[in-house]
Amino acid sequence: MILIGVDPHKSSHTAVAVDAAGHQVARRRFVVNAGTFRRHMRWCEQWPERRFAIEGASGFGRSLAQQLVAVCENVVDVASTL
């Protein structure tokens, strides 16, 4: 299982894939535009068993979270402050 953490900002999203042991296996920055979701999903296809943790899914990450849920991905919201 891979956990894909996403730090969304107004103009870009940074995604980091972490394995079950907590090791970073990949990292990618996506510029936010009309093709962002498609590129993000293409990158994630290499991990068929995955979950998403989106920082601030009710803020800048809202659109991404909604699109992921719409295609039946497992998504959790992560608070932007501890």
Language-model-derived ranges and their functions:
Residues 1-82:
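Phosphate- and other anionic-substrate recognition elements at nucleic-acid/protein interfaces
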